[in-house]
């Protein structure tokens, strides 16, 4: 992702974020059979673009109570210094105007606007004050802040690439984020025949092993709506 419009230098750009999204889209089409016209990929998305596409996704959900929604994001995250609430940072947003970004609590609320069979969130980002790049968007004085994360609602399941006090790294050899690379590899190896619990467990173990080798360990996280019983077995 290119954050140059915020006035920041190129070091805070997120390497391979667009590549992550394009490859994830390919697997949604080829492995899960998602119709091509029902997928939107938005490279270098501004806040306005992200809100617009979220509205499109919610409107799609309004047409079918058996709909399954997928939201994937690769890029920067951070948390509000005052509230500790985590946000996704579109390319025109920095830590200084973070509340104009996409808060995770608002994202979960939007995805639960209408009854759906399932809403699945995949986040290759971190919210600790560390970033998927060579430099931070805001000086944190070396302190990583654990964000205050709201729970998903309705039939919503959220996978994220690292725990609240960790950074998410990029896999330069593969030109992807570590989390996205192993997420897609796990889906590919299982030929799409895998439960959500198995997908999380296998991806998490692979990411943890690979990032331990570079001494930047990531422990992916899974959060499910407390009212969604049986999500573990969904394929």
Question: What are these language model-derived features?
Answer:
Residues 1-235:
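Cysteine endopeptidase catalytic domains of the caspase/legumain-like
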